[in-house]
A protein has these predicted regions:
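Bacterial N-terminal signal peptides that target proteins for export
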Residues: 1-6
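Non-globular targeting/processing and membrane-anchoring segments
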Residues: 19-364
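Bacterial N-terminal signal peptides
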Residues: 7-15
Length: 364
């Protein structure tokens, strides 16, 4: 019987391993496995954390990556946020936003609803939040002071996005809409100052920059400067997003820095319909975590390091046709739910065959 049990276990393992990777880098980007939290801190002796207004505000933002803290500058004097504010010479009462890397932004005035709108409801922030579930990714283009370089960089970004869109039918999962370019002109800096601040930009850069954002407002890699943009950096980063999660990509690239993003239950339900599973489901998160842990157990370092030799883009997605606009016929999306159903059917058949075999052996 021990021999039959061992065979049974090996068969089950083979079935689930044969199912392959269930998720793409893009899909993992929607998860909360590693979430950048922005803290909006109201530091005020008179503010009461138990006030119904603050509780309503907290509930309203439960599903996005903005958290509210009500702190008393006297009773909470040793709180890291209060100490950080004091080190910056901030006088209380004050309302500050703390980034995941502990950078601090001081607001003028204490109108919490206006501040909330500045953080999560800027024109471009709302646009991206609406687009992310339906598109491949966003190429966020920040204009610099040099108009000529701005024009050149935008041409390269648009071409790279078009090239990726041509490759999308050959990627592990089909996405209906390709990358979208969202430019930020120098005239947008005031209205988008907090979105830009979250990306580390506090003034108009000398040269244009590009950020590739996907999933739940995640950045893959780092900011791309003018030289990197003209050398195909946008294409390289976008290609990584289309790969499956076992492509050898460093975990820190798949779960990169996030911008503050308005995300609610409607966003979650809409995404679930599109990808075929709930990215916030504990079982899905456990499976994603298992895959990522396996991929990064060996050779993990403290810094982000892209190793081109671990990802053969031509082999993964097919050769890129230079200047070609042809696209392949799109195939139905290989949803994880379908893969699981097929695996369970195969498992049922195997168990039935093993059972019949054991019964036959006993009779003889």
């Amino acid at each position: 019987m021990k021999k039959y049990t061992l065979i049974f276990i090996l068969l089950i393992t083979a079935v689930f391993n044969a199912a392959g990777c269930r998720f793409t880098v893009r899909e993992i980007g929607f998860s909360i496995l590693s979430q950048d939290i922005y803290t909006l801190a109201v530091i005020d002796e008179k503010a009461d954390a138990n006030d119904s207004f603050w509780k309503q505000f907290h509930n309203r933002n439960r599903d996005c990556n903005l958290r509210l803290e009500i702190l008393n500058p006297v009773h909470d004097a040793e709180h890291p946020v209060v100490k950080n504010a004091k080190q910056h010479g901030i006088k209380f009462p004050a309302t500050v936003l703390i980034a995941p890397d502990n950078r601090l932004y001081l607001f003028e005035g204490n109108n919490i609803l206006k501040i909330y709108s500045e953080i999560l409801e800027s024109k471009l922030g709302l646009k991206m939040g609406t687009l992310f579930p339906d598109i491949f990714a966003v190429a966020f283009f920040v204009e610099g002071k040099d108009a000529r370089k701005n024009k050149t960089a935008l041409i390269h970004i648009n071409k790279n996005c078009a090239d990726i869109e041509n490759l999308m039918p050959n990627m592990p999962k089909i996405i209906k809409n390709g990358p979208v370019v969202i430019p930020v002109s120098t005239g947008d800096f005031k209205s988008e100052k907090l979105l830009l601040w979250s990306l580390g930009i506090e003034k108009v850069p000398e040269e244009p920059l590009a950020f590739i954002l996907y999933g739940r407002g995640r950045i893959i890699g780092e900011a791309l400067g003018f030289k990197q943009i003209t050398e195909g950096g946008v294409y390289k980063y976008l290609s990584m997003i289309g790969a499956d999660c076992e492509c050898g990509l460093d975990r820190k690239w798949m779960l990169g820095h996030q911008i503050p993003l308005l995300w609610n239950m409607d966003s979650r339900q809409h995404l679930t319909k599109l990808v075929g599973f709930d990215v916030d489901n504990p079982m899905i998160l456990a499976e994603m975590s298992r895959i990522l842990a396996k991929e990064t157990t060996a050779g993990a370092t403290g810094s982000v390091a892209f190793a081109p030799e671990t990802i053969d883009l031509d082999k993964t997605f097919g050769n890129q046709s230079s200047g070609s606009n042809s696209t392949s016929t799109q195939q139905p999306e290989n949803e994880p739910g379908k893969a699981l159903i097929y695996s369970m059917i195969a498992l049922f058949l195997i168990v039935s065959l093993v059972g019949v075999f054991i019964l036959f052996r006993k009779k003889n």
